[in-house]
Every structure is written in structure tokens, then in C-alpha cells.
């Protein structure tokens, strides 16, 4: 039996990784995982609580373990956290264990998609746009570094983007 390939979705907050990932997994008959949801299941607490109690460093440690564990599976679609690429170990795991798809979006779209979401600790500030711009400056080159495929998600439905990914991957 042929080995099933993994698809890892990377990109900023609000790019649509979780929504697109669910569509993609369903269309390809693969298992879907979301690293943030997995962290919440393992800790029994939401991401905001983990950030409050353990800080970003504690969250990133948990995230690295979850992604290391999940990326060892075969035949999954994994939606990663936006900041996961800041870890060289995570970038190496993703690159070595599957196809990395960078879901690219503009800051304007990120702001629009995340403005009412209170579950994003890094955006609970007076100027979330500034935070998103600063994060993009740091993270976008890292997404590009490990991406096998780059897909723009602005002004397209999750299903259309999932179809584009399938087409680009030749599945």
C-alpha cells in the first residue's frame, strides 16, 4: 500500500488554515488536525488560558510537542498555529514529514477575519493591525522558506482554495 502524504498548512492568523484544512481533509479523505485544538484537548484549557498562565514561551513548548507528535502520523492535514514557524525544529519537522502549503493573506483580510475573535491572545491589544504587521515581517519569510506551495486566500471561499491546493499538488 502506498504511503499517505501529509499536508501541513502554515500561514498567519486569519488566513483560513483551520477552515481550509477541514475542506481539504474531507476532499482527500484524510484525517484533519488543528494544532491549537490539540493543545486545548491535551491541557483541558483554552489557548488564552495557556498564554495567561505559562506565557507565550510555555505555549510554544506545548505547540512544538503537539506538532512533533502529529507530524509523525501519515495521511493527515494539519493546520498549524501562525507562530509555529518561528521554531526551527518545527520548520524542520514540517519540511521533512510532508507537503507544506503556505496560505497567504493580506493584513487587511487578517484584521477583518480576526477583529471579533477574543481567542487570539496576541491580538488583545489596542492596535491589532500593528501586531499583525510586526508578526508578518518576522513570519512571512519563514512561511516562504518552508513552503512547497503558496496559495492566496483573499476573496476566495475555503472550498475554492482547497480545490486550488489539490490542483497544485496534482492530487
Curated annotation (Swiss-Prot):
Catalyzes the specific phosphorylation of the 3-hydroxyl group of shikimic acid using ATP as a cosubstrate. It catalyses: shikimate + ATP = 3-phosphoshikimate + ADP + H(+). This is Shikimate kinase. Its EC number is 2.7.1.71. Belongs to the shikimate kinase family. NCBIfam families: PRK05057.1. InterPro entries: P-loop_NTPase, Shikimate/glucono_kinase, Shikimate_kinase/TSH1, Shikimate_kinase_CS. PROSITE patterns: SHIKIMATE_KINASE (PS01128). The gene is aroK. ATP binds at residues 14-19, 120, 156. HAMAP family: Shikimate_kinase (MF_00109). It comes from Shewanella sp. (strain ANA-3). The lineage of its organism: Bacteria, Pseudomonadati, Pseudomonadota, Gammaproteobacteria, Alteromonadales. One of its GO terms (molecular function) is magnesium ion binding.
